[in-house]
Each structure stands twice: as C-alpha cells, then as structure tokens.
Amino acid sequence: MINVFQLNYEARLRSWYELRQNLQNADVQTKCVIIDRFWQSVPLVNHYLHPYDIDNWPDPWELVAENNYCEIARGLGMIYTLFLLGIDDVDFCLATNDNSEEVAIVLVDNAKYVMNYWPEMVLNISSKDFSIKNKLDIDKIKNIIGDT
C-alpha cells in the first residue's frame, strides 16, 4: 500500500479531504481510530515544531503542504482533523510515559481516547499510563484554523 505522505501535495490534500468526508457520520471512537491510523503513517523527523511556539505553527493546509512531521506536528494533524470534524473536546499534552519517555499525546472526550502514541492503540491505553507535564493551549490551536 502506498503511503500518501510520500505523494505530492495534491494527492496528500485529496486523501486528507476524503478521510474527513468518510468520517463525517462516524462515532467519536471510530473517528479517533481512523484519524490516528492515518496520521501515524507520516514519516517522522526529530524536531519540526516547538511546543511553546504555537503562534508560529502552520495552519492545517500548510502542515499538509510542508509535509514535515515530528511527534508534535503529527499530533497537530490529528487535532486539526478532529476540529474540522466538529470534535472539540480535545487536549494536547506533553507527557512522560511509564518508561520515562517524553511524548506528545492527544486526549479526546475527557481523555477517554488517547491518540498519537501507538498505532492501533487509541482505545487500549489509559491516560493513567502517562504523567502529564504540560497541556498546550488548545484555544490558540483552534485560532490557527479560525484565522485561515
């Protein structure tokens, strides 16, 4: 299967649009699983976005166009997709897992769903497995979409 993130901008944009269209009527659980699976396929770099420089983060379409993803950028793609589907009970957290590794996790529906950790594990990981170090300003992230 071809990784959409290895294709050109138009193909990535079309695939992301089709993902959102296909999930319009899905329940929150299904949306979380499919969105996580989609964004988990991005090729990762070590550092792209700084967690405390939200004002300079790309909007959703710039993110897809630039096609550079660290764990934070991958989580941001998930959040943008959730927001565009009308899901706004979302938190973006910097945390450490039970192995003391730093992670950027997306919590949905009052932390019922944990995204941006392991593929296919959206429903199987408890937020208790993490020590939340900082919650990023979700309103600033929402404003990025509002400004486009």
Across the structure, where does each feature detected by a protein language model lie?
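A structural boundary/capping signal
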Residues: 1-148
